[in-house]
Amino acid sequence: MMEMIQIWAKILEPVLIHFIAINIVQMMGLHADAAFLTTMAAVMVLPFFCYMMKKDGCFQKKRKTLAIGKAVEIALLGIGANAVCSILLNLINSRAGFSNDAQEALFGSSFAVQLVGIGIVVPIMEEVLFRGLVYNRLKAYNNEWWSMILAAGIFAVYHGNPLQILFAFPMGLLLLAVYEKEGTLMGPIVLHMAVNISSILFTAAGSL
């Protein structure tokens, strides 16, 4: 029992660090802008997460590169997946009436902060956190498929509300599939950026 607790403590350690960082930034009252606060928390924890990946031995493995053509394919996949998921979630939300206040707060921030923070910085941090650390630590104790399900579940639940969980779980599986296929975090980072940036652009276009 104690060994299991220690295993899960190690797996979820980076998630707890990010949770603490978010609360520290909020308590500091640096800015009321939700996207700015989220970005600041990401900037705070990213160096620690990179150090943790290095300590885990992730950087000792042979690193694969991502060709430009492949990056474009992955970005288009992300845009398409985001469009499909958004349509389905809008249909679900129109019937179930789930609250999506957190997402609306992020998209209510200034366009520049959204684009740089939510579109670039946060995807990098979340991929290092959820795919680089949580998933790889899960794989040390479980088979690949079970690790993917657990990692996607943790990624989804961490997003907080029912509507985002419905979006984040399949997206988490897709990000992991790209990670496994490409053998580099650059794959899911590009996909995640494409998803977030396309969401920002679609939302901005819809508000015109």
Locate each region found by the language model.
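Active-site His/Glu-centered metal-binding helix of metallohydrolases
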Residues: I124-L129, L133-V134, N161, A194, ...
